[in-house]
């Protein structure tokens, strides 16, 4: 899935739910009607799809500040210049707001590399 398509899906789900705290999904299931407390395969697929785009992305200080309450969900490393780099996920789901923030960071990095 292209990064722009994934960002559109995230924005649609945030609009549908009304906030970004809900775990993202790659299917059309309605998160408001799903009662399961287990992580669904759609949530796992969503997290893996986002990770595919954001792995090895350097985060800004603002990104880190926004992610701080949930930073334990991410695998991070320090780069050679002291930057914080996303290397993986420690959970099998990712909130819509975190996914949106991480994808925006990946887009900034891609734009800077192309520029």
From Swiss-Prot:
<dbReference type="InterPro" id="IPR015103">
    <property type="entry name" value="ProtTyrPase_YopH_N"/>
</dbReference>
<keyword id="KW-0843">Virulence</keyword>
<feature type="region of interest" description="Disordered">
    <location>
        <begin position="19"/>
        <end position="38"/>
    </location>
</feature>
<feature type="compositionally biased region" description="Polar residues">
    <location>
        <begin position="27"/>
        <end position="38"/>
    </location>
</feature>
<dbReference type="Pfam" id="PF09013">
    <property type="entry name" value="YopH_N"/>
</dbReference>
<dbReference type="InterPro" id="IPR036484">
    <property type="entry name" value="ProtTyrPase_YopH_N_sf"/>
</dbReference>
<protein>
    <recommendedName>
        <fullName>Yop proteins translocation protein M</fullName>
    </recommendedName>
</protein>
<dbReference type="GO" id="GO:0004725">
    <property type="term" value="F:protein tyrosine phosphatase activity"/>
</dbReference>
<comment type="function">
    <text>Belongs to an operon involved in the translocation of Yop proteins across the bacterial membranes or in the specific control of this function.</text>
</comment>
<keyword id="KW-0614">Plasmid</keyword>
């Amino acid at each position: 899935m292209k990064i722009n398509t994934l960002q559109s899906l995230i924005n649609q789900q945030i609009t549908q739910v009304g906030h970004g705290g809900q775990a993202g999904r790659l299917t059309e299931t309605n998160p408001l009607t799903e009662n399961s407390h287990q992580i669904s395969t759609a949530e796992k697929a969503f997290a893996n799809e986002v990770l595919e785009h954001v792995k090895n992305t350097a985060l800004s200080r603002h990104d880190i500040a926004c992610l701080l309450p949930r930073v334990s969900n991410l695998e991070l490393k320090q780069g050679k210049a002291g930057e914080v780099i996303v290397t993986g996920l420690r959970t099998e789901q990712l909130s819509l707001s975190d996914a949106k923030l991480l994808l925006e960071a990946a887009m900034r990095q891609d734009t800077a590399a192309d520029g």
